[in-house]
Amino acid sequence: MASPTPAARALLLAAASLLLAAAPATAQSDGEGTVTWSVRPADASGEDGRAWVEQELDPGEAATEYMAVHNLSDTEVVFRLSAADGFFQDNGRFSMLPSDEPSTDAGLWIEVQEEVAVGPDETAVVPFTTTVPDNATPGDHAAGIAASVLSEQAGEDGATVGVESRVGFRVMTRVTGALAPSASIEDVSSSYALSWNPLAPGRAQVTFTVVNTGNARLLVTGAATAAGREAAFPGPEEIDQELMPGDERRFTVTVDDVWPSVFVPATLNVTPVVAGEGEGTPVDTATADAGFWAVPWPQLIALAGIGLLIGSSLWGRRRSKARLEHLLEEAREEGRREAAEPV
């Protein structure tokens, strides 16, 4: 059976890896060698230190940027160049649509040559042009641009499967016009995990969805508060959480050291800010009630146990007192009988 053509392989993708503005990637090429390469934003002379491209354009306007494709391999490589709609994954990382999925937005606005040949340990600076349609809606639009190599791998059934490995970066375009950033909180649910040690508090978990209801890219932060305890999100070790217009993302925040009090008042606050140009522009805070029921069973059981001990002690004391009074009465009666007997 003949090997698939590059076009056919692109349609038979079983997996595609994409690194955006990250460390150089390594992949097996169609040949025998290993290909290592990086792709970063550039100006006409070379890499310019940016992590990705941010641009603000009017409807109908065009702008040219550059990408630097650095071949770190020891042989010449022909890289396939492509642009596609961009999106944020559920974990907050940026990606772009795979080659076999058609773009519908900003990925269609970018024109770039189909391929570029780069010699060993050389860098090619390639221009690309973003042309905003006349009818583009105001606000933020995401795309990605990448250089890729195709390789072949054997599937479990022995068939040859094409794998595309891509390295690229974001191209974030803000179309001028009225910017209306906003966000909402939906589908809030809370749960509580008891500590069966009555002297230790439990922890609450608040799960919710943040929806970007405006037309601007948002950086989302916030906090959940329960019974006076607070937990912020994202955590200090987590990446920034960005939402494109129309995006929604599910979060779970854990609040530690919460005492059960039958009903625990809890509040959720989401404080988004506009990302990109105008970064830090405040947006109305979204607030939602997250109160939940938390019956203090360990404490109630402990109190019940203490109550039983106290009740048992009081009952024992009363019983002892009654027995003592009974014995004293018997002794008095015996004394009276002895006193009544003739001498």
Task: Describe each region flagged by the PLM.
Residues S29-V53, S73-V125, T221-G222, G228-A232:
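Surface-exposed binding patches on compact interaction domains or structured appendages
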Residues S38-S73, V77, S184-P201:
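Beta-sheet-dominated interaction scaffolds and their linkers
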Residues G49-R50, G60-Y66, T123-V126, P138-G144, ...:
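Short, solvent-exposed loop/turn segments enriched in Ser/Thr/Gly
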